[in-house]
Structures are given as structure tokens and as C-alpha cells.
Swiss-Prot record:
A Pfam family of this chain: RPE65
InterPro entries the record matches: Carotenoid_Oase
Enzyme class: oxidoreductase
Protein name stated in the entry: 9-cis-epoxycarotenoid dioxygenase NCED6, chloroplastic
Region annotation Disordered: where it falls in the sequence: 1-25
Free-text remark on how the cofactor is bound: Binds 1 Fe(2+) ion per subunit.
One Gene Ontology CC term in the entry: chloroplast stroma
Gene source species: Arabidopsis thaliana (Mouse-ear cress)
């Protein structure tokens, strides 16, 4: 694998491509499908040349003589002992850089704001603001294994103004980890999934500890990558991943991005939070979880009011640290998954990964009252054959007999360790309804849509914690790429699809409501990559009929990424720094 990053990974300039303004038609099959045809007008070239993306230029810190000697010695230990140990370990596809950083998963350089982008169609006037999407984009070549989740966080931003005026930019989130590695000009922080495996992983940890001991690096200021989730709360855009505190990112008046710094909610917390906090649309409160792999309590539930003040900090008792990427809220409760992927650092001593799939473990959901102060009244309900990496919504109902029920909508993945290891089994991700009877402590799971992988999506955020009808979700086929968007009526299983077309793939769709009308009155947006023509686009789809209304040709390649959000014009004005 080539390890020379940046210039060799810049997109090649190609001739102007045809672009789509679909005239969808209904396919006569069991599900209503609106197909995007490929008869499309031609986009003109950009009116002016686009400058090459900028990169962070390493500047080396001033070391005293003893530090230089120690650093040189540790470098020799790395090259003569640690790296050979890592190279002797066969890499499965989920941690093989040749796989994880291939094609449109490869990293790109930062791109300053590019204005005056070509738009085909008309962007609705209600969409004034900035679409933000987070993703993993390693600054430096991996030294050994590399998992998709290990890359440095990079945010891609599409700013939409009046009269079809659109700009684009992308910037690294300047985490403490990235700032230190940039100063050193190389990767030095351990990659939690790609590198921390077996004895070579222990050696990598020992090497990092030694470098920290001589003052070359400092892990106390944060070791996270902030590459997964984004949320706008209390005047702040926060980028986050489960390995650290969030990072605040400023969106300036030109649509550029600037990292403000690590954000501990005004020093009210000092531990990492998960990538998917929930903002209650009714109260405005932010709910989240924080877990600690090394010590108890392994999990805490946190709540912040609209002013950003922490109003709940509740310990959740778990027998072992569990990987939790997402959770759900209802009007009165918090729904917490405790599933089969757990952390066991002792497995590294035995030559394995610290993130393991415990096949015999029974998945369960904990239901905690938002008013609970101690966590002692949490109710656990077993949910067999269930592993949900993402939960899309939850709400409260009652059975005909009057039993209280929590309804959870999530994507159930099989095998559960698909993302982390090679099981040899085909991946299935089933959009499911999970019903938790709070009187009988029994559960029932029903697959809403069969025969298609549905993962990474949005609902109308006004319905978070309340009964909803629709979810807009990526069609993850061929796995792990996404070939289109499915609008799913979760009440009756009806599906409408917007397909990107041959050799065209995207990611998580982002739903933006239009006013306060019907639940599906709004627009779905996201990035699309044409792998055959080597071009990237930003598309906007009418959520009611799943027809494309506008598309923007982007000046640079946008890699596949993770999660996004839309920051409205009013929210931009409310930013605080």
C-alpha cells in the first residue's frame, strides 16, 4: 500500500460530467420505488480554477538534548521492535489500510471556501444555512492496522445562501491529538481499533506511555478524533466521538470552519460522551451518555438544560464496559442499549482485540426515568437476537390491556461484530421495531423492511421521543457503500426509494423540515460520489415524493463519511464562542 498521503490522493481533474435532475417514475413492484433516471443535462465547468486544498504543515517542537536522545531511542525501538511485531500480524479487512483507505474512503486535504458553485435545479428558499457532515480522514499514513473509525475528524460544509448561492469547504477538527501529531509530523497516538491488538498493541501502548513520560506527547489534554457525530446545541456546533469530550467548531460568515477547542460544557464534565446526543424538541434539553472503559461506573447518563447547565448526572450500573454508540429518549424515559460488543482489555494479553463480541451475552435495553437521580430504578428488558448500532427514535404507548410499552426503532445488525472483524457471514442490517413491555419485562422485535440493508439515517427531529411515521435512511447496498435513500413508513412498512444511479454512492441522508407542517414536509440532503466519473455532488431531494430538486457540483472529492446535521441561518446567528 502507498503511504504517501495528500498530493497523490487529490482528485484528478476530469472533463465536465452530466448531472441529474430526475424525472422519477414508479416501479411496479411490491414496494413503491421512485427511480432516479440517468438522462441528465450537462454541467458547465467552474468559471474559475479552484486552488489546491491546503494541508497542515508540521512544525517540530523544540526539544532539549535529553528529550532528543530519548525520542531517538524510542523511535529506534518502534522501528526495530514494535513495527515488526505489527507487520507479523495478519490484518483482517476491517483493519487493513489497503481496504479501509481505498477508493473514496481515502483521505483528502483541507479545502478553503469555494464560492459560486454550479447548481442544477433550484434549492428551496427554506434551506438557508449550512449542511455539516463529519467523517474520518487520517492526516498521516497508518503505521500498522487502521480501522475506519480511527481517522482524524474532518468536517465538510455546504453553505446555502439566497438565490442558489452555494459554497463548500472542509477542515480538520483540530483535536489535541491532531495538533500534537502535526507538530511532530507523524502519527504517534495509538489507533484504538486498528493498532491496539494483542502483544503488538500492548507494545504500542507502552511506546506511547514512554513518549508521554519524556514530554514528547501529552494524552491528558485529550486523545480523541472527533470524527463521528455533530450536534448544534446552545449556540455551539459540537463534533464528537466516543473517545473524548466534544470539540466546538465555529462556522464563520463565509462558510469556513474553525476549531474553537475541547468543550466540557463549561467544565461541568471531564469524561467522554457518545457520538449521538439527543436534543428533546419539546424541552430543548440535551441528553447524552458517557462511558468509561477503565473504571466504574462504566456508564453515566447526563442531561443539560437549554442554558447548558448540567441537571442530571446518573450512574448506570453495568457489569462490564459495553460499546454504546447510540441510545434513544422518549417523552419521559431514556432507553439505553447494553449489547454484545464489550471492552475487555485483558484480551490483549491473550493476543486478541480489546473490543470483542460476546456471543453468549443477552442483549438488553435499560429504561430509565428522566427524573431518576440515582439510577437505582432502571428497568432492564432482554431483547434476544438484537444488536443495534443506531436507534432512530423511541416513544411510549400502551397495549390493549393497558400495559406501558416503549417502542424503539433501530437498525439491527447481524453479525454484531460485522464492523470490527471478518466473520465470513453476509451482513444484514434490518430496520426493526422493538417493543418493550414494561410490566411483563418482555420484548418483541419485528422487521419493518426485509431484504435490504438500511443503516445511517434521520427522522424529522421535531419528533424525537414522540411517535413518528417516517425514517429517511441509507440503502447500504452493496455493503458498506450506500446506493440510495429509502423513505420508510414505519407504521406500515411502505418504502419509497431515491437511487443514486450506477457507480454512484452516498452516505447518511439528512432530513430538514420545512416549517411546522406534515412530518414529511421537508427535504433530504447529502453527498454523492460518482466513482466512474470521479466527481462529487451535493444533492437535495423533496422528502414528500423523493424526487431530486437540486444538485451542486463540488470542486473537490468528498470521501464517504459518518453523520451530519443542518445548521439553520438563525442558529448561525446564535453561535457563541
Amino acid at each position: 500500500m502507498q503511504h504517501s498521503l495528500r498530493s497523490d490522493l487529490l482528485p484528478t481533474k476530469t472533463s465536465p460530467r452530466s448531472h441529474l435532475l430526475p424525472q422519477p417514475k414508479n416501479a411496479n413492484i411490491s414496494r413503491r420505488i421512485l427511480i432516479n433516471p440517468f438522462k441528465i443535462p450537462t454541467l458547465p465547468d467552474l468559471t474559475s480554477p479552484v486552488p489546491s486544498p491546503v494541508k497542515l504543515k508540521p512544525t517540530y517542537p523544540n526539544l532539549n538534548l535529553l528529550q532528543k536522545l530519548a525520542a531517538t531511542m524510542l523511535d529506534k525501538i518502534e522501528s526495530s521492535i514494535v513495527i515488526p511485531m505489527e507487520q507479523n500480524r495478519p490484518l483482517p479487512k476491517p483493519t487493513d489500510p489497503a481496504v479501509q483507505l481505498s477508493g473514496n474512503f481515502a483521505p483528502v486535504n483541507e479545502c478553503p471556501v469555494q464560492n459560486g458553485l454550479e447548481v442544477v435545479g433550484q434549492i428551496p428558499s427554506c434551506l438557508k444555512g449550512v449542511y455539516i457532515r463529519n467523517g474520518a480522514n487520517p492526516m498521516f499514513p497508518p503505521l500498522a492496522g487502521h480501522h475506519l473509525f480511527d481517522g482524524d475528524g474532518m468536517i465538510h460544509a455546504v453553505s446555502i445562501g439566497f438565490d442558489n448561492q452555494v459554497s463548500y469547504s472542509c477542515r480538520y477538527t483540530k483535536t489535541n491529538r491532531l495538533v500534537q501529531e502535526t507538530a511532530l509530523g507523524r502519527s504517534v497516538f495509538p489507533k484504538p481499533i486498528g493498532e491496539l491488538h494483542g502483544h503488538s498493541g500492548l507494545a504500542r501502548l507502552a511506546l506511547f506511555t514512554a513518549r508521554a513520560g519524556i514530554g514528547l506527547v501529552d494524552g491528558t489534554r485529550g486523545m480523541g478524533v472527533a470524527n463521528a457525530g455533530v450536534v448544534f446545541f446552545n449556540g455551539r456546533l459540537l463534533a464528537m466521538s466516543e473517545d473524548d469530550l466534544p470539540y466546538q467548531v465555529k462556522i464563520d460568515g463565509q462558510g469556513d470552519l474553525e476549531t474553537i477547542g475541547r468543550f466540557g460544557f463549561d467544565d461541568q464534565i471531564d469524561s467522554s460522551v457518545i457520538a449521538h446526543p439527543k436534543v428533546d424538541a419539546t424541552t430543548g434539553d440535551l441528553h447524552t451518555l458517557s462511558y468509561n472503559v477503565l473504571k466504574k461506573p462504566h456508564l453515566r447518563y447526563l442531561k443539560f438544560n437549554t442554558c447548558g447547565k448540567k441537571t442530571r448526572d446518573v450512574e448506570i450500573t453495568l457489569p462490564e464496559p459495553t460499546m454504546i454508540h447510540d441510545f434513544a429518549i422518549t417523552e419521559n424515559f431514556v432507553v439505553i442499549p447494553d449489547q454484545q460488543m464489550v471492552f475487555k482489555l485483558s484480551e490483549m494479553i491473550r493476543g486478541g482485540s480489546p473490543v470483542i463480541y460476546v456471543k453468549e451475552k443477552m442483549a438488553r435495553f435499560g429504561v430509565l426515568s428522566k427524573q431518576d437521580l440515582t439510577g437505582s430504578d432502571i428497568n432492564w428488558v432482554d431483547v434476544p437476537d438484537c444488536f443495534c448500532f443506531h436507534l432512530w427514535n423511541a416513544w411510549e404507548e400502551r397495549t390493549e390491556e393497558g400495559d406501558p410499552v416503549i417502542v424503539v426503532i433501530g437498525s439491527c445488525m447481524s453479525p454484531p461484530d460485522t464492523i470490527f472483524s471478518e466473520s465470513g457471514e453476509p451482513t444484514r442490517v434490518e430496520l426493526s421495531e422493538i417493543r418493550l413491555n414494561m410490566r411483563t419485562k418482555e420484548s418483541n422485535r419485528k422487521v419493518i423492511v426485509t431484504g435490504v440493508n438500511l443503516e445511517a439515517g434521520h427522522i424529522n427531529r421535531s419528533y424525537v421521543g414522540r411517535k413518528s411515521q417516517f425514517v429517511y435512511i441509507a440503502i447500504a447496498d452493496p455493503w458498506p457503500k450506500c446506493s440510495g435513500i429509502a423513505k420508510v413508513d414505519i407504521q406500515n412498512g411502505t418504502v419509497s426509494e431515491f437511487n443514486y444511479g450506477p457507480s454512484r454512492f452516498g452516505g447518511e441522508p439528512c432530513f430538514v423540515p420545512e416549517g411546522e407542517g406534515e412530518e414529511d414536509k421537508g427535504y433530504v440532503m447529502g453527498f454523492v460520489r460518482d466513482e466512474e466519473k470521479d466527481e462529487s455532488e451535493f444533492v437535495v431531494v423533496d422528502a414528500t415524493d423523493m424526487k431530486q430538486v437540486a444538485a451542486v457540483r463540488l470542486p473537490e472529492r468528498v470521501p464517504y463519511g459518518f453523520h451530519g446535521t443542518f445548521v439553520s441561518e438563525n442558529q448561525l446567528k446564535e453561535q457563541v464562542f
